[in-house]
Amino acid sequence: MELKVFRDVLPAAGADCTAKAELPLETELLISDYLPPVQRIVKCFAKPVVLQKQLAPGRLTLEGYLRCTVYYQGEEGAGLCQTEQKLPFTKALELPSFAATAWTACVEGQTEYLNCRAVNPRRIEVRGAYGLVVSVHAQLSTEVITALSEGGIEQKPVTLAGVRRAATLEKLVTIEGALTFPKPPAAILDITGTAEVRELKRMQGKAVAKGVLHVLCAWRAEGDAALRSQTADLPFNQILDADGLSEDGRCLCVLEPVGFAAAEGETTEDGSASTTLTATAMLRLSGWRPYQLQCVADAFSTRFETTLTPQTLATESLLCALDETTVLRGSGPLPDAGAQILACFASFGPVSLTRQEGRAVLTARAVVSAFAENTLGEMECYEKALDYALPLPADLPEDADAYPECWLSVQDLQCASAGGALDVSLTVRAEGAVLARQTASLVGAVELGDPLAPADPEVSLRICYAQPGEELFAIARRYHVSPGQMLAANDLPDGTARLDEARRLLVPGV
């Protein structure tokens, strides 16, 4: 008799690979005439901004720019000054060849080294390298057996649950607003920001993200070397086209500022100055749709020899969403006990997921750079490394692997000098999600062979001495009888799959 096989498709977890690459940095920065000449280099930073990702068989191509920012001490008491340059790059990373119906690539990294020197008061030379770490995760639509019928077939069902990646979108957006200073600024040294997505509406094929970008500006007034700070809130409302997104899915949205531009404004009658501020930010949207599918984990026939071809696949599930804030504190001695802190910055290395004392923990290394003026009037940079560790709000099963799809941002940073030591307090916000992968063993193919030998008519009773932990389905397969008949013949409760204790089982005749 012909066996009927029913199949369906589920989004199995696909490739999981990591690639590393180096972005060389070699450039010269010319100091504009309206900026003070260089007296002393304080610190140089490099940060990549990835604008496009293109996946081809065996290759991932990244396009973007590397922002090189140099802080220096200006001549003739000009104080702390800043200049920057954007260096475009295209980088191809070699990957294993794999098929995918959906994929995501998370780009992280850290500065490997930077050598910065002033060739003359109007020219700065920078040499260095930035190390990229790219994690690629894919899903692949895979056909599975969901049911079998006829041919005396018995099957062991298992329900697989997970998420289908419905949308992965990265879009560069522009947010405009006003930044008001109490008096016209002589120099704007740095503008940073943190975003807050307050409302996310999703509909068929679209998403609407609303929120506020909190901006913090470090600036200096005319004739004053002291740094001042000014804040502003820029509301945003972005409509995103995301095919595959639906109202019943799970959706996360993160906005990361990548650049700011301030245009000269007008001075009002009270002496304040209003500046037009344009923020460039990377809007990241991830959407998943949950699914459940009943599959066949094992099978046999009560009438024919049965040959099974196993199938092993991994499912992907959303372990937890992240929107957690953690405070890191540290201190260390200052080379000059009388140094005065002027400004501070923080950067993060790659995020990883480890198990510590049985719990899954998100870890990263944060480096705080504090600019200070020593007792000789020279500006220097002091650094303090902090270890970031965030226990996940959900338990990770022992048989599961997980990977983070999240971003770290600075919510607050305070540096102070007290008693000859540098005290640092860094508030870190983690946004995104953690996905888990679990392996399942299924039946990939079934083939019926010759009919089984007829039962011995002289054997009227068969008894099986079952051991604790044995599966009822395995016992039934051993004797080529239906598991349902085994339940009925031994008065076992419906749904019994495994024996809790040793017992004698009556094996019904075929």
Q: What are the residue ranges of the model-derived segments?
A:
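Membrane-lipid interaction segments
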Residues: 1-450, 455-458
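Primarily a LysM-type cell-wall glycan-binding module
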Residues: 449-488, 493-510
